[in-house]
């Protein structure tokens, strides 16, 4: 289908790049004209394993020949096995499955609100992102995502990231939960500090408040740990996840510590397709591949290597303000809008992303190699030089 016909029938809610992707393998994708691209932001954060990982493909193919969907009024082995894997690799509790990060966060919001009738306020962070459904978008601390959707649900307040004193001033006995990402993704790749994370946990303990960590983007090995909270000496009470958990298949989930598992009862929450056997089989394959292929170690090692290369660029170009992030979730903040750099890289067959207007977001597959990193760094530097030369001509 040509892009003009596509645009005629598909609602225009995305700013699309002018390429039609038809195939992917590893870190490479191909368009409908046969051109190959190096994808350094696969699946918008949902491609931690790269495209079409062989073990994920095999698991999906096997499951689809057996049964495609099982309603949640019956038992489903794949769902149970994936839940067991998640709990064994995090903290004791139970898991609810859905289809996306927004749904996972909505479920977490329902759980913390239902726990205590006198605790309804949820504190999130400014510049956060939690999804586009009505409660999740209200939890998102960016007014641009709220515009036009009023009246929004009440009960949400927003704290500055890493501002411990502000957080302390906002806490009271009516706060049901603190909810935030260990690294703000859409907010510009801003890691939460050790001090803020520790204070959040302590304040939750002091006020009988639940700590909800949104690991939709930071989870599944992205930061060099299976979940980013594992870099801190802290455990959440509720953990949300999605994106890369399915290796490209839609899936979402939230896990809850054992002591809070009886809050949601039959009929209080549900999802028709949540825990679908195909999605859960893919999730099992993803977690097993991460362990079998030592991908957490690779994410840490390659994350350090990529960060060093970005810091080297920063030392050469004054338009690079800061490099930040954890593992292979890195951002390079510029003093100029990043969209044109992304376009220059696209022309050179490298796919990148710009978030928060000036932050280049680099989140390659966690099995990335030094060779691929070097290639992308070269292209980014060429794009910067092109942009600088263009600016001098104005």
Where are these regions (language model features)?
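Conserved N-terminal phosphate-binding loop of PLP-dependent enzymes in the Aspartate aminotransferase
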Residues: 1-394
């Amino acid at each position: 289908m040509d892009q003009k016909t596509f645009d005629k029938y598909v609602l225009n809610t995305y700013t699309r790049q002018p390429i039609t992707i038809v195939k992917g393998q590893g870190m490479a994708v191909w368009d409908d004209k046969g051109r190959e691209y190096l994808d350094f932001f696969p699946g918008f954060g949902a491609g931690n394993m790269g495209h079409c990982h062989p073990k994920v493909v095999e698991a999906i193919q096997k499951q689809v020949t057996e049964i495609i969907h099982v309603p949640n009024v019956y038992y489903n082995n794949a769902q149970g096995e994936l839940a067991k894997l998640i709990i064994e690799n995090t903290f004791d509790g139970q898991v609810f499955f859905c289809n996306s990060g927004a749904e996972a966060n909505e479920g977490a919001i329902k759980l913390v609100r239902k726990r205590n009738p006198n605790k309804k306020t949820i504190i999130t962070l400014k510049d956060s992102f939690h999804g586009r459904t009505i409660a999740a978008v209200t939890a998102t601390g960016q007014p641009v995502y709220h515009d036009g959707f009023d009246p929004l649900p009440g009960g949400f307040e927003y704290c500055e990231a890493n501002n411990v004193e502000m957080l302390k001033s906002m806490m009271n006995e009516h706060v049901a939960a603190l909810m935030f990402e260990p690294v703000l993704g859409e907010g510009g790749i801003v890691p939460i500090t050790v001090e803020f994370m520790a204070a959040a946990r302590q304040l939750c303990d002091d006020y009988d408040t639940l700590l909800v960590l949104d690991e939709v983007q930071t989870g599944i090995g992205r930061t060099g740990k299976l979940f980013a909270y594992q870099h801190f000496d802290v455990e959440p009470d509720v953990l949300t996840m999605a994106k890369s958990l399915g290796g490209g298949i839609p899936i979402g989930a939230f896990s809850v510590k054992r002591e809070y598992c009886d809050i949601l009862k039959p009929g209080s929450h549900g999802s028709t397709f949540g825990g679908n056997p195909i999605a859960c089989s893919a999730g099992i394959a993803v977690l097993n591949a991460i362990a079998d292929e030592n991908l957490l170690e690779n994410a840490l090692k390659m994350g350090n290597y990529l960060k060093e290369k970005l810091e080297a660029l920063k030392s050469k170009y004054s338009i690079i303000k800061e490099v930040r992030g954890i593992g292979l979730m890195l951002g390079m903040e510029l003093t100029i809008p990043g969209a044109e750099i992304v376009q220059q890289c696209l022309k050179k067959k490298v796919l990148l992303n710009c978030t928060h207007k000036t932050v280049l977001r680099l989140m390659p597959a966690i099995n990335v190699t030094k060779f691929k990193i070097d290639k992308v760094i070269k292209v980014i530097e060429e794009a910067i030089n092109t942009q600088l030369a263009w600016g001098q001509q104005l």
